[in-house]
């Protein structure tokens, strides 16, 4: 039993929180062959509360898919302007020009205008980035998505835990919950309006669902023992979770409307960290049934289970990419815990993060292009991002405290 408890504690603490203030992205490695794009500084942007063209440039540069310059040249050119049209009202317009089409109106590949308040300038900037990204790459952009994470602020004899939500680039952080007890395992509902998480309020584990906009909360699971690792089904009607109410930790699925439970695993091993497939038919989970932590896949309907990770002695916290073929996971290499991608069809594992430090808590962007995780960087616990092919690496340094246990939102709006 001591071995079981220590494994569960390790599993849970891999997701436990540090502290996170305003973030600034730092691109540590970019992809070769990035698409050149010229983003000309928007006229009027310097006098507005937010510099729209700078935000768009940062978004596209940090995606790793683009090489951004401010010189007007090449096939892809972005121009725009920001006009003050009233008290705290701005008109933002932009054009994406295709240099191959010429220099007149025929060169306009994409254009849009917005009338907004000053407080919406960052939001519109991210929307412009999404539009440009999708037009050029054919894939939906992730710049308007959000991230959730837990912050631990430590002082002598006391820790404070804060569940926060911010833009995907770390700006506009907003606390959802502050507690003197641990908070962990945030999981976004597929509608992007709710977050499920584990809270130890009252010194016991509870799974709570909180409305992101209103802050209203409801306790979904408060059984004796472990209530952990919530994961929303793709249709938003069910929650996979880990319960130990009958002894060993096992995977269950709860119907959120009726609160009825279906037990998925039923044995004396440690079964934890469930994650849904995109079609909602199967669950990935971590189990020590083979001797050490490995990732397994089980049918929600039949309970038929098979092992999917074989490379290495430690693989855990698997989650599907949107294609249903690739799985992000924690993979131990040479004593370090790294973020890796498992190709289920080929059976191959690709390590994505550097091998000189531990990384954990992978969360995949909704378009599958990037993976968010927590790691140690320059002696601090911070959030990092890595592209699904490992060619692009970003760190989001926290200015105060430690940041960990991130969760990427679905597409919003």
Residue ranges and their predicted role:
Residues 6-15:
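Bacterial N-terminal signal peptides
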Residues 23, 74-131:
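Amphipathic beta-strand/beta-sheet edge segments enriched in Tyr/Trp
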Residues 24-83:
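Short beta-strand->alpha-helix linker/helix-N-cap micro-motif
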Residues 140, 152-162, 198-206, 221-226, ...:
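A flexible loop/linker signature enriched in serine peptidases of the S9 family
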Residues 141-143, 190-191, 234-235, 278-279, ...:
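Residue-level detector of Asp-centered blade-edge/turn motifs that repeat once per structural unit
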Residues 147, 195, 236-240, 280-284, ...:
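Hydrophobic beta-strand positions that form the internal "hydrophobic ladder"
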Residues 167-182, 210-228, 254-272, 298-314, ...:
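Multi-bladed beta-propeller domains
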